[in-house]
Regions:
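Short hydrophobic alpha-helices at membrane interfaces in multi-pass membrane enzymes
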Residues: 30, 39-61, 95-102, 184-198
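Small-side-chain structural scaffolding
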Residues: 2-3, 37, 55, 62, ...
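Alpha-helical transmembrane segments of multi-pass membrane proteins
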Residues: 25-37, 55, 73, 111, ...
Length: 230
């Protein structure tokens, strides 16, 4: 779970109590990783469906609290579910495409819930609805102007990316393993953990890189160390 905290070290090295980073942007990634762990360990198909429903509901809340964190959660959970099917079926099998479209549908529903919730609250408080530009004003302004963006340096960032790429490379070869009907003999626990953490790592990198402080690399060390340990 520590792999997704993405922020507490800010409090240690600079005393920056910016709670929009932690715990607000960390709670839902941590919770989702916990749900993924339970989902993977559960054998009951019904229980898996319930856990998946809870996960998508939490993703809708994540989008509401912090849109970027919610997008990270969407990518990670959808990728995890698709990966589990890819261990069982080839990409030519209709079952895996059914899973892919189901994850896209769930992602769209979560985003619509977020938009409707924001619009409802805004309308009740102001009597007006937000336009699309107003709804995503903060994100568009930040990305468009490079607000507080600093050029990244090489060194630790390159090591970080190398670890993520190697972890992803180590997880994917099992997709080429022999599939026998619904079963695959190889244990996919390690490769699933590598895949999920690597995707988290890439998403977190795209989010934190260059933002305000070059020392943001230290907020991502949990992921790197966890991958190296695995």
């Amino acid at each position: 779970l520590s792999a997704c905290t993405l922020g507490p070290l800010n409090l240690l090295y600079c005393g920056n109590y910016y709670f929009q980073y932690f715990p607000l942007r960390s709670f839902f990634p941590i919770s989702l990783l916990f749900l993924i762990s339970i989902h993977y360990a559960t054998k009951s198909r019904k229980a898996k469906h319930i856990i998946a429903a809870v996960a998508w509901a939490s993703i809708a809340l994540a989008l509401f609290c912090n849109f970027e964190s919610g997008i990270i959660c969407i990518i990670v959970f959808a990728g995890y579910v698709i990966l589990q099917k890819a261990y069982l079926y080839t990409f030519g099998d209709p079952k895996i495409w059914k899973t892919i479209f189901a994850q896209i549908f769930c992602a769209i529903v979560s985003i619509l819930i977020f938009i409707c919730t924001v619009q409802l609250i805004t309308y009740l408080r102001s009597g007006q609805a937000l336009g699309i530009n107003e709804l995503f004003f903060g994100i568009l302004a930040f990305e468009g102007t490079g607000f507080y963006m600093l050029p990244i340096s090489f060194g630790l960032w390159i090591v970080y990316i190398i670890v993520l790429v190697y972890a992803l490379y180590s997880a994917l070869p099992k997709l080429k393993s022999e599939r026998v009907g619904e079963k695959q003999i190889a244990d996919t626990r390690i490769s699933t953990a590598l895949f999920v953490l690597a995707i988290y790592g890439f998403c977190a990198f795209s989010y934190f890189v260059g933002r305000s402080y070059s020392t943001n690399i230290y907020t991502l060390l949990f992921i790197t160390l966890s991958l190296i340990h695995i």
